[in-house]
A protein has these predicted regions:
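Glycine-rich phosphate-binding active-site loops on the catalytic face of alpha/beta enzymes
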Residues: 87-99, 188-190, 254-263, 310-311, ...
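Glycine/Thr-rich beta-alpha phosphate-binding loop at enzyme active sites
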Residues: 34-47, 191-200, 240-301
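Glycine-rich beta-to-alpha transition loops that act as phosphate-gripper elements at the mouths
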Residues: 69-72, 146-150, 231-237, 303-315
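Active-site glycine- and acidic-residue-rich loops that bind
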Residues: 151-170, 197-199, 204, 228-249
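A gly/proline- and charged-residue-enriched helix-loop-helix capping module
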Residues: 94-142
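Alpha/beta catalytic cores of nucleotide-metabolism and tRNA/nucleoside-modifying enzymes
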Residues: 1-46, 113-114, 120, 131, ...
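Conserved, mostly hydrophobic/aromatic
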Residues: 25, 67, 89, 129, ...
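Catalytic cores of alpha/beta
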Residues: 74-81, 235-249, 297-301, 311-328
């Protein structure tokens, strides 16, 4: 496991450093956070506990708490967070080529939330990131790569002067990255594009996922990374059973429930008014829990679920497990608290498991339906 090197801050210096990060702009704060993680400056208080360990899809994880996509697009800090207590991580999301949409980020500290106004995925492009994945391929950490596309018009995108179908684009990205990761997440969750509507259309979704499976088999027959699908929180009650049926038909390995929530569709009162954009953080929790429980029921517990969104405490994590999630991803809380959030949530989850007499987190999965 990768160990950061450098001078480690004591608790007092960390508190001062983190106070400073909170006072500067989100962009510069993120740069300092990344520097602290990469340099090994942050104190590491994580203590392993056998109750947290879990086995899923052939992976042995020391904790179900992982780092979600959106936190690390540079392949720079997820491995450091795994060293500091996360069980796994996910890079991205990446589009095939670089995208630099105009993006505004608002930290809603009173609401424990972030609002992002963007019509795409700001990233340097998967093609440009492949060398970074090659460089870290010998690390033992369990990591995934989140791949996405931004719809330019119905059914196809224009790339490098030619028309490329969604199936082709997802397959190309999968072939590029499959040899260097443990799982691939096909992301349909961007609420500010119509692309997420694909998930309820079997004629579009199933061929895409079967193409991705074929690409994995061709590019990484030995590693054979697992395939997850990230579905949006904004689907309707009528669409969700269809989506679950499509996922089972396509034969994917699991589903990621969550991601950002569209403010234009969610009736959430925030301390500051924002009429457009994508919301992440604590206010997403009720939506995530509701969808986890429904997906768990519709798939009869046969499809592993990763909860993504709204987790701020060990109690939140336990509620996700009880609703049917096997793993949990955090992201927004890391931007507010830094790496100590990983240690805190793990510790709180252990305390809850002890108090309820559980010997492992797996005993809590789907507890609401037992």
């Amino acid at each position: 496991m990768k160990k950061p090197t450098g001078v480690r801050l004591n608790n007092l210096l960390f508190s001062i450093f983190w106070w400073f990060i909170q006072k500067i702009s989100p962009k510069n704060g993120e740069k300092l956070l990344y520097w602290g993680l990469q340099s090994g400056a942050f104190p590491n208080r994580f203590r392993e506990d056998p109750r947290l360990a879990t086995d899923i899809l052939g992976f042995h994880l020391r904790t179900p708490i992982g780092v979600g996509a959106g936190f690390d697009k540079r392949v720079g800090v997820v491995d450091d967070l795994i060293f500091m207590g996360a069980g796994f991580g996910e890079f991205g999301p990446y589009t095939l080529e670089a995208e630099q949409p105009v993006t505004e980020t608002f930290f809603m500290r009173r609401d424990k939330a972030i609002v992002v106004q963007s019509l795409g995925y700001k990233n340097t492009g998967l093609l440009n990131m492949v060398p970074a994945f090659i460089n870290r391929r010998y690390l033992p950490n369990i990591v995934g790569v989140n791949i996405a596309i931004t719809a330019e018009f119905e059914g196809e995108n224009v790339k490098q002067g030619r028309v490329m179908t969604y199936e082709e684009e997802f397959a190309i990205m999968t072939r590029k990255i499959a040899p260097y990761c443990d799982f691939v997440t096909v992301n349909f969750s961007h609420p500010e594009t119509e692309l997420y509507r694909i998930v309820s259309d079997a004629s579009m979704m199933v061929p895409i996922l079967k193409n991705v499976k074929r690409a994995v088999a061709e590019a990484a027959p030995i590693q054979s990374p697992k395939i997850f699908v990230k579905i949006p929180l904004n689907v309707t009650p009528l669409e969700l059973p269809l989506i679950c049926s499509h996922l089972m038909t396509a034969g994917v390995d699991g589903v990621v429930v969550g991601g950002p929530l569209s403010l234009s569709q969610a009736k959430i009162k925030l301390s500051r008014k924002h009429y457009a954009g994508m919301l992440s953080g604590a206010p997403c929790k009720p939506f995530v829990l509701d969808m986890i429980s429904k997906v768990y029921q519709f798939t009869k517990g046969k499809l592993p679920i990763i909860a993504c969104g709204g987790v701020w405490s060990g109690e939140d994590a336990f509620e996700c497990l009880a609703a049917g999630a096997s793993l949990i991803q955090i992201g927004t809380v890391l931007r507010f608290e830094g790496p100590k959030a990983v240690t805190r949530i793990n510790h709180e989850l252990v305390t809850i498991l002890k108090s309820k007499g559980f010997r492992s987190v797996s005993e809590a999965v789907g507890l609401d339906f037992k």
